[in-house]
Amino acid sequence: MSQKTVKVQLVRSLIGTREDHRATVRGLGLRRLNSVSELQDTPAVRGMINKVSYLVKVLA
């Protein structure tokens, strides 16, 4: 059975954000504005997305 995945896109700039939020975005594999990362859909990843939900958009 294949793992479920989720695609995340960085849609807002990291300028002026908290340092731990920047680290969370880097942990999601996002570097530049509009970059997309495909990750396994786990509770840890969901928590990271929830923490920086004002910066990212979930695509799938």
Curated annotation (Swiss-Prot):
<dbReference type="InterPro" id="IPR036919">
    <property type="entry name" value="Ribo_uL30_ferredoxin-like_sf"/>
</dbReference>
<dbReference type="GO" id="GO:0006412">
    <property type="term" value="P:translation"/>
</dbReference>
<keyword id="KW-0687">Ribonucleoprotein</keyword>
<protein>
    <recommendedName>
        <fullName>Large ribosomal subunit protein uL30</fullName>
    </recommendedName>
</protein>
<dbReference type="InterPro" id="IPR016082">
    <property type="entry name" value="Ribosomal_uL30_ferredoxin-like"/>
</dbReference>
<dbReference type="GO" id="GO:0022625">
    <property type="term" value="C:cytosolic large ribosomal subunit"/>
</dbReference>
<comment type="similarity">
    <text>Belongs to the universal ribosomal protein uL30 family.</text>
</comment>
<dbReference type="GO" id="GO:0003735">
    <property type="term" value="F:structural constituent of ribosome"/>
</dbReference>
<dbReference type="Pfam" id="PF00327">
    <property type="entry name" value="Ribosomal_L30"/>
</dbReference>
<dbReference type="InterPro" id="IPR005996">
    <property type="entry name" value="Ribosomal_uL30_bac-type"/>
</dbReference>
<comment type="subunit">
    <text>Part of the 50S ribosomal subunit.</text>
</comment>
<keyword id="KW-0689">Ribosomal protein</keyword>
